[in-house]
């Protein structure tokens, strides 16, 4: 099937699934954020009680969803992508609700963006950390909507990079966002095989990382022996894990990470999605693949809201809205607005598909 044929097959259900999956991951993951040791039975008990809850909107979203909403609003208002508009929306969203869990570093970026002193919207991010920029996962956590708005893979890469660079100037930060956007993009294309999916991601990231030499940052900020094509290295490790059976979660965390760095979380989200395409012996089969993905990603501990929101976006894009169950959907704040946004993003996607 041609690329155009595959793109034309993307459905509203997939776009809704991606945004709702991301929201579910954020809201549910936030309940466990910051704990290095999350026990799976605790996550399953949390889910069981949640499904019995009669009151709607009992789980609240974090900065992950707040920033995702800002991205969506900007894309809808400025379909050709406008970094000035997006930066303004980031800063204003923070100013409106500063208690959603923002990190101290990005708060300084937002405050500078609110100042008339800065005419270059990328400058505040470049000034972070003595000019090295942030390598955190904040650009990746909000980037799924880029893949949901633009069918062309080069647009996905370009706009994922630019949207992330508004707050994350380190190649490790914005390349993590590109990888997450690509994962959503490829998940939208229909039935996939895990190895093929990973090979597609590795192929794109080899070109991107090789061209930008982001590995120089990996030596400073991460493991000294992982200095060449860091995201590709993690993707290859995922292939190794998937080829094995019953890999301990401790090994997943040790090798892929569960932290706030993009390198320590985006590959973990991708692994969670791919691992949960098949049954997990520790997670009851009554849960579907999307639910299993979110449960599993939370059980890895660490930055649970962000890893789960990224994994949820990928899984939702692949499985669609059918796997977003009513009891889970009802539990989340802003679910109605999220579904409304999905319709508008899908309309934008279809318009972009028709653009020569």
From Swiss-Prot:
Mg(2+) 1 binds at residues 26, 62-64, 305. The protein undergoes a dramatic conformational switch from closed to open states upon substrate-binding, which enables specific substrate recognition for the 1''-O-linkage. The glutamate flap (Glu-33) blocks substrate entrance to Mg(2+) in the unliganded closed state. In presence of substrate, Glu-33 is ejected from the active site: this closed-to-open transition significantly widens the substrate-binding channel and precisely positions the scissile 1''-O-linkage for cleavage while securing tightly 2'- and 3'-hydroxyls of ADP-ribose. Activity is inhibited by calcium. It comes from Latimeria chalumnae (Coelacanth). Pfam families: ADP_ribosyl_GH. Binds 2 magnesium ions per subunit. Its EC number is 3.5.1.-, 3.2.1.143, 3.2.2.-. Monomer. GO terms for molecular function: ADP-ribosylserine hydrolase activity; magnesium ion binding; poly(ADP-ribose) glycohydrolase activity. This is ADP-ribosylhydrolase ARH3. Mg(2+) 2 binds at residues 33, 303, 305-306. It is found in: Nucleus; Cytoplasm; Chromosome; Mitochondrion matrix. ADP-ribosylhydrolase that preferentially hydrolyzes the scissile alpha-O-linkage attached to the anomeric C1'' position of ADP-ribose and acts on different substrates, such as proteins ADP-ribosylated on serine and threonine, free poly(ADP-ribose) and O-acetyl-ADP-D-ribose. Specifically acts as a serine mono-ADP-ribosylhydrolase by mediating the removal of mono-ADP-ribose attached to serine residues on proteins, thereby playing a key role in DNA damage response. Serine ADP-ribosylation of proteins constitutes the primary form of ADP-ribosylation of proteins in response to DNA damage. It comes from the Eukaryota. InterPro entries: ADP-ribosylglycohydrolase, Ribosyl_crysJ1, Ribosyl_crysJ1_sf. One of its GO terms (cellular component) is nucleus. Substrate binds at residues 63, 132-138, 168, 260. Its cofactor is Mg(2+); Mn(2+). The lineage of its organism: Eukaryota, Metazoa, Chordata, Craniata, Vertebrata. Changing residue 33 to Q: Complete loss of activity. SUPFAM superfamilies: ADP-ribosylglycohydrolase (SSF101478).
